[in-house]
Amino acid sequence: MERFGYTPAASLSVPVIPGLTIASIPLSQLDDVRRMNRDIFSEERVINSFEKEDLMILEARLDGEPVGFKVGYRESKKVFYSAKGGVVADQRRNGIALALLDDMMRRVEEKGYHVFAFDTFPNLHPGMTILAMENGFRLVKADYNAVYKEFRLRFERRTQAPF
C-alpha cells in the first residue's frame, strides 16, 4: 500500500490540554455519553447496537466535566471502525476531538488492528473531514446515505501494528 502513498503514520499531533482526561467506560456508565449525544446530534440513538465485538467507548472530561465521547468496534479482523464521536459545542476547536481520535487509535493499535476507519457526513460535520485530511487519513469511499439524506465519506488510516 505504500506505493500508493498510503503509509502508516505515527501518533497524531495532539496539543496538551490541561485538565483533559480520556477514559474507557463500560456500558453501565453511558448516561453522560447519551446526554452528550442528544445535545450534539439531536438524536437518542448513539449507535445501532452496542452488541459489537471489541466495543470501545471513550469519554473525555475537562476538569471533571464530560465534554466528548467516541464509540467504536471491530469491523473485521484487521479493521477497527469508529462509529460515532462528538464534542460539546462550547468545547469545539480546542483539540478534544483530535485527542479522542488519537487515544482511540493508540488503543486500537495495541489490540493489533491494522486499519482505523470512520465515516463522516461532510455537509453536516465538515470539521471531521478537515481533521481526517490534516492527519494522514485517506478518503477511500464516497456514497449517499438515504437515512440521513446526505453524502457520506469513508476515511481510513493504517496503524503501526505489526502484520
Feature roles, as predicted:
Residues V33-F41, M104, V108, A132:
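Hydrophobic alpha-helical core bundles mediating ligand binding, dimerization, or RNAP-core interactions
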Residues E2-R45, L153-R154:
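Short amphipathic alpha-helix that is part of the acyltransferase structural core
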Residues R3-A9, Y144-F163:
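C-terminal "cap" of GNAT-fold acetyltransferases
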Residues F118-T129, A146-V147:
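Conserved beta-strand-loop-alpha-helix junction that forms the acyl-donor binding cleft
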Residues Y6, A132-A142:
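Conserved acetyl-CoA-binding loop of GNAT-fold acetyltransferases
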Residues S24-V79, A83, V88:
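Acetyl-CoA-dependent GNAT
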Residues V108-F121:
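Conserved GNAT acetyl-CoA-binding A-motif
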Residues V87, R93-R106, E134:
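Conserved acetyl-CoA-binding loop-helix of GNAT-fold acetyltransferases
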